[in-house]
Amino acid sequence: MEGKAYALASGTIINAIATGKGSAFGLDLKVYAKVKLIDDGKNKIEGKVLDNPNIKPNLIVRCVKNTLDYFGLNYSAYVETKTEIPIKSGLSSSSATSNAVVLATFDALGEKIDDELILNLGIKSSFDEKLTVTGAYDDATASYYGGITITDNIERKILKRDKMRDDLNVLILIPNLEKNVDVNRMKLIKDYVEIAFNEAINGNYFKALFLNGILYASALNFPTNIAIDALDAGAITAGLSGTGPSYIAMVEDENVEKVKEKLNRYGKVILTKPNNDGASIY
């Protein structure tokens, strides 16, 4: 029994840590998962992160285990993943990994695809491995469904879904900066993030993304000038993704080179597109 699936990275429109409500959109960078199941009653699960053997496979093993436990099965399994998503950079690599592995396990089992169950098993696995502060329902849903999702992470509810303009390019900057997750500082900006969140609910996604990025970058001591530099070079919007250190900029074709040149001075730049199609078995 074998299953294969992929899920998407996501970029932040509103980080949910301050208010419990967030928004993200799917990016065309993927995690691919392959799961093999053996009906031997031994419940022995092994995993391998192919592109980074130094990373412990705890999350991917946990995703398979939680899925098999849900169906009351004691199969053994082997799971492997490979990724196009930079890890620990604010691009939802763990949400994407969880979604891909759980979906691949469903495929291997021949189970009917239940979107909400797959999302919840992935989130449970991230909580079990202490990889999330809020459950990251915004990231998880954008990674799974593609497009834009606006969510209440506490209630695990989707408040709104929309398509992201896929004629735009997304430039992702991975700067040489340390990650900093100071939850208390992020809670301080709650009332101001609420203003950005209302912009998102009203469909002003680019405005929301920029405001959110400035607020969280300030709270987490990341440079705020990077987003302004991107705008100066012609980006439509730009801001910190997740809790950083990545920044994302939305750019029309004619300004890609100018914005890329500007961002290059701060670190590595990746060019991708929005993805409105979401996760899939392949």
From Swiss-Prot:
Main location: cytoplasm
Location of this chain's protein in the cell: Cytoplasm
Keywords: Amino-acid biosynthesis, Aromatic amino acid biosynthesis, ATP-binding, Cytoplasm, Kinase, Nucleotide-binding, Transferase
A single GO cellular-component term on record: cytoplasm
Catalytic activity from the UniProt record: shikimate + ATP = 3-phosphoshikimate + ADP + H(+)
Family to which this protein belongs: Belongs to the GHMP kinase family. Archaeal shikimate kinase subfamily.
Name the UniProt record assigns to this protein: Shikimate kinase
Native source species: Methanocaldococcus jannaschii (strain ATCC 43067 / DSM 2661 / JAL-1 / JCM 10045 / NBRC 100440)
